UniProtKB/Swiss-Prot annotation:
Lineage: Archaea, Methanobacteriati, Methanobacteriota, Stenosarchaea group, Methanomicrobia
Keyword Ribonucleoprotein: yes
Keywords recorded for this protein, A-Z: Ribonucleoprotein, Ribosomal protein
Gene designation per UniProt: rpl21e
Classification via NCBIfam families: PRK04306.1
Name used for this protein in its record: Large ribosomal subunit protein eL21
Protein family according to the UniProt entry: Belongs to the eukaryotic ribosomal protein eL21 family.
Superkingdom of origin: Archaea
């Protein structure tokens, strides 16, 4: 059988976009910046493959702890443990205060 354990497996409904929101995201989502200590939501943008976090973190909220090139380093709780996630800004949304 063919290899079937890719990074996007089991994402048929999780990464689906609305019909009107299909296509590439606006430039404002690419150039957004965050401050260290700021809370952000991990919302995977399925049309952008670069800098995409693991599907496990889709819908989670984390804290920005640094920057790695164009991507941001986040601290996200996964059960009892705290994990570091690297994601580009297209896959992040700032939490409203």
């Amino acid at each position: 059988m063919a290899h079937h354990n890719g990074p996007r497996k089991k994402t048929r409904y999780k990464f689906k976009k609305d019909l009107r929101k299909r296509g590439i995201p606006p430039v404002t989502s690419v150039i957004q910046s965050f401050e260290i200590g700021q809370r952000v939501h991990v919302v995977v943008e399925p049309s952008v493959q670069k800098g995409m976090p693991h599907r496990r973190f889709h819908g989670k909220t984390g804290t920005v702890i640094g920057q790695r090139g164009r991507a941001w380093l986040l601290e996200v709780r996964d059960g009892d443990s705290v994990k570091q996630v690297i994601a580009r800004p297209q896959h992040l949304k700032a939490q409203k205060v």
